[in-house]
């Protein structure tokens, strides 16, 4: 080290320590110096490990953003920011009137802002699951749509129709008219409030193409919907807004707070067009509110028919 300084070389103090430590270890353990990797090799190995770690983190991030993941038979992960969605929801842990099973799920994204707003789950009452194949039977499908592909199976034709912009609205409407009870679970991915949730529902319903033909009924129903939001204030992310479409077409709204571990009734909407238009927007049209939800719903219904 003295000779190096005498030549005017600038050597980092940390490197002197490494040299001194290696020399001392050689004497202690009786090793030859050639068995110790040069410091450049150590740095290269460290850099390689660091890059590998970054790659693994990136890979994990890509996996987490890939879309809904089925964790097990009892729940599905819709988005990593919120709790997994339970496949079966029923009283008394909720204020639902009966037991429901999850058929479709996915995030609701605001495209022009580029972020996810909430996780959505579409459920059907367990007692009404047998109604789906009865309503969407081959005879009905052929009468409703003359262009049914004879080369495909019945389930394939149903799946294709549920993904079609026009046919999907017809099928969802037929299920609702046939008495199938639906339920939507909305779980905010970001902190929000009841006013934003209410305004989002109103906007979605007003965007339904049949609204203009039913202005009086829709106007009356939207006022009922606004009145149903009896609770005000903030809604933390991961809480649940539960919208149950009952057999008579009315909507029952309830709220579940995870922090307080309680459910509370919000209100109800008696005008049947409001519920029908809302669930049609979730599952039908050329721009459904959550395309992944419609996709998973269509895949599940295919297995039922």
From Swiss-Prot:
Pfam families, sorted: Chalcone_2
Superkingdom: Eukaryota
Transit peptide is among the record's keywords: yes
Single GO MF annotation: intramolecular lyase activity
Family recorded in the similarity comment: Belongs to the AIM18/AIM46 family.
Predominant location: mitochondrion
Entry protein name: Altered inheritance of mitochondria protein 18, mitochondrial
Cellular localisation: Mitochondrion
Interval spanned by the transit peptide: 1-22
Keywords on record: Mitochondrion, Transit peptide
Gene Ontology CC: mitochondrion
Record has Transit peptide as a keyword: yes
UniProt-listed InterPro entries: Chalcone_isomerase, Chalcone_isomerase_3-sand, Chalcone_isomerase_sf
Organism the protein comes from: Lachancea thermotolerans (strain ATCC 56472 / CBS 6340 / NRRL Y-8284)
């Amino acid at each position: 080290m003295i000779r190096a300084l005498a030549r005017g070389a600038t050597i980092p103090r940390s490197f002197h320590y490494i040299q001194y430590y290696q020399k001392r270890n050689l004497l202690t353990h009786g090793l030859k110096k050639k068995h110790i990797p040069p410091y450049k090799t150590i740095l290269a190995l460290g850099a390689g490990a660091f890059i590998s770690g970054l790659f693994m983190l990136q890979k994990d991030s890509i996996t987490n953003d890939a879309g809904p993941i089925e964790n097990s038979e009892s729940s599905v992960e819709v988005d990593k920011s919120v709790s997994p969605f339970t496949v079966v929801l029923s009283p008394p842990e909720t204020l639902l009137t009966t037991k429901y099973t999850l058929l479709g799920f996915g995030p609701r994204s605001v495209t022009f802002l580029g972020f996810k707003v909430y996780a959505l789950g579409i459920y059907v009452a367990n007692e009404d699951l047998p109604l789906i194949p009865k309503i969407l039977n081959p005879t009905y499908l052929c009468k409703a749509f003359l262009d049914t592909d004879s080369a495909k199976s019945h389930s394939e034709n149903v799946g294709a129709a549920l993904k079609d912009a026009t046919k999907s609205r017809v099928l969802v409407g037929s299920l609702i008219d046939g008495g199938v009870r639906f339920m939507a679970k909305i779980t905010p991915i970001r902190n929000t409030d009841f006013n934003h949730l209410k305004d989002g529902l109103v906007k979605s319903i007003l965007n339904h193409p049949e609204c203009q033909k039913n202005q009086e009924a829709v106007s009356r129903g939207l006022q009922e919907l606004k009145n149903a939001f009896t609770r005000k204030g903030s809604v933390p992310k991961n809480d649940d807004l539960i919208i149950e479409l009952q057999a008579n077409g009315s909507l029952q709204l309830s709220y579940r707070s995870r922090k307080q571990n309680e459910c509370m009734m919000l209100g109800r909407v008696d005008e049947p067009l409001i519920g029908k238009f809302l669930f049609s927007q979730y599952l039908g049209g050329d721009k459904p509110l959550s395309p992944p939800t419609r996709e998973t719903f269509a895949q599940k219904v295919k297995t039922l028919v």
